[in-house]
Amino acid sequence: MTSLRSTVWRALPTAATVVLTVIIGPSAHADALSRGTAAFDRGEYARAAQDLSPLAARGNPGAFGRLGFMYEHGFGVPQAYPAAFDLYCRGATRGDPFAQAMLGLMYDKGHGVHHDVIQAYKWLNLAAARSQGRAREAYLRFRDAVASKMSRDEIIVGQRLALSWLPGVLVNGRLSGQ
């Protein structure tokens, strides 16, 4: 009985650490995301990159789009379209509307990726569908601007791709719906 009790007492700190990690871990990530997002919104891009980079490395969807934006425009980090595209893709496939919209705009502009209005339309449509308020209105304006450059058949293809898309799914090494 004594050995069982001592074993339990020795294991207690480890168990407490696991429980605290489960309880506190998500809020710590949320706090870091809030800090990074606030720094991003204030234009403090070096600080935002410092806060958001570890979150992106751990797969946090909200960090990918903002970091991608910084890499696309060279804000707080060296400008690098391939890095921006990769970050946008990672956020977009996890369902982050900002990353989806920015990925759509990269396809529209042909920054770091081939110009593809159908893919641009698809990602902007998905971003608008997953957003509310002013963000939704902006993404709809972007999508409609892209649509003005498209034929009716291209719009139909873009709509079908958006409807067939599933978060996080890769098909033949490509993002789903491509």
Predicted regions and their residues:
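Bacterial N-terminal signal peptides that target proteins for export
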Residues: 2-16
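N-terminal signal peptide c-region/cleavage motif recognized by signal peptidases
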Residues: 25-26
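Alpha-helical segment of the N-proximal tetratricopeptide repeat
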Residues: 31-58, 176
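Terminal, low-structured helical/coil segments at or just beyond the last alpha-helical repeat
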Residues: 135-178
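Hydrophobic face of amphipathic alpha-helices that form TPR/SEL1-like repeat modules
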Residues: 32-39, 54-55, 64-73, 87, ...
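Short helix-capping/linker turns of helical repeat alpha-solenoids
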Residues: 43-44, 57-61, 73-75, 80, ...
